[in-house]
């Protein structure tokens, strides 16, 4: 089976009568994504629906009765874009509090100065959330990480959480940790993978990995359904302004986001087709996770909102030494996928059998290999359901060939935020020359007929503003 995007109303002569109010757009360069009619010059819209795409001859009856005739003067018209991997509701959580964007090239002292300046300019801020730092740029000794004590110099009373550029790690000040009731007795969500950095007495230092960090943000007072829904609406308007008509929100671990999305949907304010994903919860069994997703689907799946996607994580990121790689990192760490091969296979099979698409985060070559093998083992289960591997930074040796063997229902999704220039040298040092030259083999995969999609992941706050 082949997945092709088609315009719904490309056929000529869709209606026999043209006695209705409509707008005709002419003299356009229209790209249709239809092999039988790849280009056109006229587009007719009636009450928000495309009723004709074609040439001037077929458009004559529409022009004769048009309520509006728009000359596009050769401008290009494209079908609506589909955001294939994003976290708009996560951005809404970030925007729900006072937010500061941090340049990934900044040092620790520069970041602290930036946050102090923000609080001076906004003395009524009750909390502060920031995002964008890169550990390698902080100017710390090899292996050192920022701590709560660093952020306590910014404020001891205002809760502060700072995400890294990939949002797979971050750190908080003592006030934020206290709000979340994080102390030496707080268990790590997944020891060694989703966890709190600790001192030699077991006390959290303030630096956190994966869901440990998200749990601290989730506990902050600004993270309320009404605040998140309010901030999500302008984010979706920004997507609209960029030409997006559908979004795959692959999910998060926040307790407010699904309800916030559903609130907009119920109010008729969800103006895009919105697919929402469910994050696998390591504290639950496979059966319990599938049951949780089914419950969300039954409660919220209606109108423009679809909840039918199961999200798995194979690993973290290269910059945090948590991407699962065949070779050890320079510090000697060998990182395995977050899930065993049996867990991966069981989760993929269960989700597909339940009728859910499966969307998987994989950065390192070993992570990619694990999920490719799991998809291959379960290829015959509900083959009409899309499988997606996201990011695909470092390809395993047979990665392109394995993608090609499953190209009928497997999408290669990637994102540009793991290809930034200021991390180039750091990445080469961490993964070595061979793996470095096996990054983002998108062209090779596309030439093999693999469907390659790109996405924003996080719609940057500066872009929104």
UniProtKB/Swiss-Prot annotation:
GO molecular function terms attached to this record: hydrolase activity, acting on carbon-nitrogen (but not peptide) bonds
Q: In terms of domain of life, where is this protein from?
A: Bacteria
* Signal peptide start-end: 1-21
Xref: Pfam families: Amidohydro_3
Task: Please verify whether the record's keywords include Repeat.
Answer: no
What UniProt keywords apply to this chain's record, in alphabetical order? Signal
InterPro entries with a match to the protein in the record: Amidohydro_3, Metal-dep_hydrolase_composite, Metal_Hydrolase
Q: Which PANTHER family is this protein grouped with?
A: IMIDAZOLONEPROPIONASE, PROTEIN LONG AFTER FAR-RED 3
**Which family would the database say this protein is a member of?**
Belongs to the metallo-dependent hydrolases superfamily.
User: What this chain does, per the record?
Assistant: Involved in the control of extracellular enzymes production. Stimulates PEL, PEH, CEL, and PRT production.
Protein name stated in the entry = Exoenzymes regulatory protein AepA
Source organism phylogeny: Bacteria, Pseudomonadati, Pseudomonadota, Gammaproteobacteria, Enterobacterales
The gene it comes from is aepA
């Amino acid at each position: 089976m082949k997945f092709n995007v088609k315009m719904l109303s490309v056929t000529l002569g869709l209606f026999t009568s043209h006695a209705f109010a409509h707008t005709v757009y002419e003299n356009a360069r229209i790209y249709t994504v239809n092999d039988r009619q790849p280009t056109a010059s006229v587009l007719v819209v009636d009450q928000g629906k495309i009723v004709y795409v074609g040439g001037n001859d077929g458009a004559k009856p529409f022009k004769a009765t048009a309520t509006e005739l728009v000359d596009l003067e050769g401008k290009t018209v494209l079908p609506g874009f589909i955001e294939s991997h994003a976290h708009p509701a996560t951005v809404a959580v970030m925007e729900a509090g006072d937010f500061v964007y941090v340049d990934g090239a900044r040092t620790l002292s520069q970041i602290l100065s930036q946050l102090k300046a923000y609080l001076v300019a906004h003395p009524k801020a009750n909390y502060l959330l920031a995002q964008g730092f890169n550990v390698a740029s902080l100017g710390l000794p090899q292996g050192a990480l920022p701590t709560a004590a660093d952020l306590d110099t910014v404020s001891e009373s205002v809760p502060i959480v700072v995400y890294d550029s990939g949002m797979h790690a971050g750190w908080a000040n003592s006030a934020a940790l206290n709000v979340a009731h994080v102390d030496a007795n707080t268990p790590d969500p997944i020891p060694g993978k989703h966890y709190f950095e600790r001192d030699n007495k077991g006390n959290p230092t303030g630096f956190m990995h994966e869901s440990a960090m998200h749990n601290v943000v989730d506990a902050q007072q600004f993270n309320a359904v009404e605040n998140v829904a309010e901030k999500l609406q302008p984010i979706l308007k920004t997507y609209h302004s960029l030409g997006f008509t559908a979004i795959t929100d692959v999910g998060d671990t926040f307790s407010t986001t699904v309800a916030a999305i559903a609130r907009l949907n119920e109010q008729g304010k969800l103006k895009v087709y919105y697919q929402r994903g469910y994050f696998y919860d390591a504290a639950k069994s496979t059966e319990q996770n599938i049951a949780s997703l089914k419950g969300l689907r039954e409660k919220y799946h209606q109108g423009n909102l679809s909840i039918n996607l199961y999200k798995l994580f194979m690993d973290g990121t290269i910059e945090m030494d948590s991407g699962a790689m065949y070779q050890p990192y320079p510090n000697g760490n060998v990182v395995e996928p977050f899930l065993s091969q049996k867990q991966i296979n069981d989760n993929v099979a269960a989700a597909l059998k339940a009728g859910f698409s499966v969307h998987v985060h994989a950065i390192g070559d070993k992570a990619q290999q694990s999920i490719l093998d799991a998809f291959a083992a379960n290829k015959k289960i509900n083959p009409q359901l899309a499988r997606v591997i996201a990011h695909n930074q470092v390809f395993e040796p047979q990665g392109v060939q394995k993608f090609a063997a499953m190209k009928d229902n497997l999408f290669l999704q990637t994102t540009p935020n793991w290809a930034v220039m200021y991390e180039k040298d750091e990445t080469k040092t961490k993964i070595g020359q061979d793996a470095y030259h096996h990054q983002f083999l998108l062209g090779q995969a596309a030439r093999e007929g693999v469907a390659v999609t790109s996405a924003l992941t996080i719609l940057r706050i500066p872009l929104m503003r």
